[in-house]
Amino acid sequence: MANINFGFEHHASKLYSGAIEEGIQNSLVPMVIETSGRGERAFDIFSRLLRERIIFLGSGIDEHVAGLIMAQLIFLESEDPDRDIFIYVNSPGGSVSAGLGIYDTMQYIRPDVSTVCVGMAASMGAFLLASGAKGKRASLPHSRIMIHQPSGGAQGQESDIIIQAREIEKIRRLLEEIMAKHTGKDVQQVREDSERDRWMDAGEALEYGIIDQVFEKRPAPEKKD
């Protein structure tokens, strides 16, 4: 059976996601204490962000991570189908099937999904960054974005390997068509550009059509009279 991934995930996400998992296991996730008339309540930082309709994708993308992201998207739609959802992306990429599950959910739900790259969006991370609502995709100035073709391993009898190779090519074509739709590039251009790792800074990603704006600094709130 073919196991299709974006190849960069193999040498980038193990250390990255491992550090995240170790931090969680060591209870290093910050807690936020809120006080009300009914006393104090403690939230981990990610749950608190979820209340503000913010989802943080900060690891490699596998089936477990995708399940969490999809569940949060569907939950926030049920809370308010008319308010935007924000996904902050800092990911080296990962499983194609898991990433497509997130992608389909982003397109399926009613709220617009705004995407922001903070740090790195490589491979499937870049794919999801580009998949945000048009006009609502952004990056911080020193983030790095990378696109490339998916990779996959095949094993078994010759006939099985041929079938799996065809499936990998079919998936590659699908990903190129989706990226072309969201960036405004033609499919052949996307194929040529993603033949090898193509790294971009925020300005280059803006020019390519992966994002719509570069955030230098959050605007100061308006002063009340």
From Swiss-Prot:
Reaction catalyzed: Hydrolysis of proteins to small peptides in the presence of ATP and magnesium. alpha-casein is the usual test substrate. In the absence of ATP, only oligopeptides shorter than five residues are hydrolyzed (such as succinyl-Leu-Tyr-|-NHMec, and Leu-Tyr-Leu-|-Tyr-Trp, in which cleavage of the -Tyr-|-Leu- and -Tyr-|-Trp bonds also occurs)
Stated role: Cleaves peptides in various proteins in a process that requires ATP hydrolysis. Has a chymotrypsin-like activity. Plays a major role in the degradation of misfolded proteins.
Full protein name: ATP-dependent Clp protease proteolytic subunit
Binding partners and assembly: Fourteen ClpP subunits assemble into 2 heptameric rings which stack back to back to give a disk-like structure with a central cavity, resembling the structure of eukaryotic proteasomes.
GO cellular component, as recorded: cytoplasm; endopeptidase Clp complex
Uppermost EC category: hydrolase
Gene responsible for this protein: clpP
Family assignment from sequence similarity: Belongs to the peptidase S14 family.
